[in-house]
């Protein structure tokens, strides 16, 4: 799986302590639609980092070896651009009997990725954070993720 980084214990992206996986691909839709430079994106520096090829079983073993993390968050750049990797990661965890929550931070809206959402519904405990980054908005508390999100159009939704 091509990633940009992995944090074994993250406490800011979900209500539970989680493993955070940074995906390595983006089409910069948020910046393009807002007509702002890509450098404004909080993930622009992440995009410049070298890709790390990480086997799914290695991610799994790191997760289950950590007594603190209770969920997995997959985020920026854009996870839906590596959907097969994301799907296969979740499938691997489920095949090993781990049904902990997966949270996918995407800049897409449900109507743009309905086919992918339908595939994700085949798994238990999936949450998506939907919505593009829009500059100059006030952050707000999301009741599903139980964390602050930076744009008021962004929201968490339980998929399954």
State what each model feature region is.
Residues 4-6, 11-54:
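Canonical Radical SAM [4Fe-4S] cluster-binding loop centered on the CxxxCxxC motif
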Residues 68-96, 130-134, 138-159:
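Conserved glycine-rich "GG(E/T)P / GGGxP" loop and the immediately following alpha-helix
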Residues 14-15, 64-68, 121-123:
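Flexible, charged surface loops at secondary-structure boundaries
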